[in-house]
A protein has these predicted regions:
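Catalytic phosphate/metal-binding cores of nucleic-acid and nucleotide-processing enzymes, i.e., regions
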Residues: 1-94
Length: 94
C-alpha cells in the first residue's frame, strides 16, 4: 500500500490531468515537480497542519454564513501581486 503522501500526489496529479513523478520530485529524472504536467509545476505538501489552511477554515466558516465561496488572497509586504487560495472543490465557482 502506498504511503499517504504518494496517494495525495496521485490525487493531485489526476485533478490537474498530470502524472505523479516517480521517485518524488527531488529525485525525478523528468521533472523536479511532484506532478508531471505540460504547463504546470505542481508541488504537493502533506502536513498534519498548515497555517494557511487554518486561515481557510476560519474564512470558510464566515463564508458559509453568507452562502459565499471562500477565497483568500495572501499578500506579502514589499512584493507585488498576491497568491490566491481556493479549495479544489470551489475552483469551478470562481
Amino acid at each position: 500500500m502506498d504511503k499517504a503522501w504518494k496517494q495525495r500526489e496521485r490525487q493531485v496529479a489526476k485533478y490537474f490531468g498530470g502524472q505523479r513523478t516517480p521517485l518524488s520530485g527531488g529525485n525525478g529524472k523528468i521533472s523536479r515537480a511532484d506532478v508531471i504536467h505540460d504547463t504546470l509545476f505542481v508541488e504537493c505538501k502533506l502536513r498534519k497542519k498548515h497555517t494557511a489552511i487554518t486561515l481557510w477554515d476560519e474564512t470558510n466558516e464566515m463564508a458559509k454564513k453568507e452562502k459565499k465561496t471562500p477565497v483568500i488572497a495572501l499578500c506579502e509586504k514589499g512584493r507585488p501581486g498576491f497568491w490566491v487560495m481556493v479549495h479544489s472543490d470551489d475552483l469551478d465557482k470562481i
